[in-house]
């Protein structure tokens, strides 16, 4: 266990700890990269050796099965660093958006072989056709791609194939 001294604990300390907690479905991304950390509050020690920590998170979508694992991962990382008094709070509104992902996280997705979300978030309008969305292949960078299935390896991804290099790949859906 890595104990923190009460006098040098800052929110930055907690952010650094949280940056070590990975998304169980995409292990190259931390919960910080994903943008699901909404807030961090330090609570006074009140007779304890270290202050308490409250971490607010927003699921990538309602009912995301990874959220229990993520909450447990956050809790365990905090405990490992001596923050035994911790609370994980779920905030549903406003809903998470791919706009909250870090640029570093998007680059990590691409390096991992998953096309990162486009910069535009939200559902397409009724007039917008799926074929108009140009998704770049994370292998060869071609935009000559086609969607194979609306659903990929997880609910937040679609399955695409590159027409140039012929490689299939997941695309992280915008929302």
Task: Describe these PLM feature segments.
Residues 1-175:
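Domain-level signature for proteins that mediate thiol-based redox and metal-cofactor handling
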């Amino acid at each position: 266990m890595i104990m923190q001294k009460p006098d040098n604990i800052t929110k930055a300390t907690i952010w650094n700890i949280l940056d070590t907690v990975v998304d169980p479905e995409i292990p190259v991304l931390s919960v910080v990269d994903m943008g699901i950390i909404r807030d961090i509050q330090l609570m006074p020690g009140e007779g304890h050796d270290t202050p308490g920590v409250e971490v607010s998170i927003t699921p990538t979508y309602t009912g995301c099965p990874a959220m229990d694992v993520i909450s447990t991962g956050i809790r365990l990382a905090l405990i490992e660093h001596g923050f035994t008094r911790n609370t994980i709070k779920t905030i549903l509104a406003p809903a998470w958006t791919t706009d909250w992902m870090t640029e570093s996280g998007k680059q990590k997705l691409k390096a991992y072989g998953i096309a990162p979300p486009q910069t535009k978030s939200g559902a397409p309008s009724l007039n917008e056709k799926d074929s108009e969305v140009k998704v770049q292949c994370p292998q060869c960078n071609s935009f000559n791609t086609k969607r194979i299935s609306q659903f990929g390896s997880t609910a937040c991804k679609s399955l695409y194939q590159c027409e140039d290099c012929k490689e299939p790949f997941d695309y992280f859906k915008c929302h």
